[in-house]
Each structure stands twice: as C-alpha cells, then as structure tokens.
Curated annotation (Swiss-Prot):
Organism field: Homo sapiens
Pfam families in UniProt: Prefoldin
Designated name of the protein: Prefoldin subunit 5
Modified residues (Phosphoserine): S56
Keywords, ordered alphabetically: Acetylation, Chaperone, Cytoplasm, Nucleus, Phosphoprotein
Gene: PFDN5
CDD domains according to UniProt: Prefoldin_5
Modified residues (N6-acetyllysine): K42
C-alpha cells in the first residue's frame, strides 16, 4: 500500500521531485488510455464493417487491400463468414454474427479498462495540482522572507 505524504512538510526540491514523478505517472496513464482508445476504435470500425455483409451485397465487386496503399479487385462471394485477426498472426473463421459478438465483447472490455484507469488519472491530476499549489506557496514564502530580510538589513 502506498504511504501517505504530508506535502506541507516537504521542501521545494522534494516538491519538485514529487511533481516530476506525478508528471510521469499522468503521462503514462494518459498514453495508456489513448492506446486503448485507438484499439477500441479499430474494433468499432471492424464491427461496423460487418453490416455491409448481407445477401444483397453478395457477388458485388470490391477492392481488397494488399497493403495500406495497394488494392486488387475482387468479388464478395461469402457474406456468412469472416476471418478475424485474434493476435500474434492467428486468424479465426467466424460467422458474421459471431464476429459482431466478438467485437462487442472486445469493445466492452476496453471500455471497462479505460473506466478503471480514468479515476487513477484524475487522482494523479489532483495530486499534481495540490503539489503545484504548495510549491507556489513555498516560493511566495521564500520571496516574502527574502524581502523581509533585505528590508531588515537596510
């Protein structure tokens, strides 16, 4: 369990170190959420593409991607089955309905993961804000102390 730190007892360099650590944690959590959103978007797009697979589109011509910028002409001859990339180079054949369920489960899982990370991110933001406010107070105190000492010497 993480230990509790009273930030009022920390000096300016310690507060700076704590702020830097919180910056790194906020960056990590933000990056994690962004990556999860990218993957989730891919699953949403894949699920939406399954709506094109219906009997009225069977036999229609289409462009099949060979790379991200190269396509070959093809015909849609099976609207009942699809191959799904399940990771690490493995593909599974599923019916269009099973594929929709698969993508829905993936989307829901990623949504739950983002919902778990979001509170931690908000907590780190709040902690960082508190540290920055304390740093500002300490700097003001040091400035006032320096001004008082300068006035006393004069």
């Amino acid at each position: 369990m993480a230990q509790s730190i009273n930030i009022t007892e920390l000096n300016l360099p310690q507060l700076e170190m704590l702020k830097n650590q919180l910056d790194q944690e906020v960056e990590f959590l933000s990056t994690s959420i962004a990556q999860l959103k990218v993957v989730q978007t891919k699953y949403v797009e894949a699920k939406d593409c399954l709506n094109v697979l219906n009997k009225s589109n069977e036999g229609k011509e289409l462009l099949v991607p060979l790379t991200s910028s190269m396509y070959v002409p093809g015909k849609l001859h099976d609207v009942e089955h699809v191959l799904i990339d399940v990771g690490t180079g493995y593909y599974v054949e599923k019916t269009a309905e099973d594929a929709k369920d698969f993508f829905k489960r993936k989307i829901d899982f990623l949504t739950k993961q983002m919902e778990k990370i979001q509170p931690a991110l908000q907590e780190k933001h709040a902690m960082k804000q508190a540290v920055m406010e304390m740093m500002s107070q300490k700097i003001q105190q040091l400035t006032a102390l320096g001004a008082a000492q300068a006035t006393a010497k004069a």
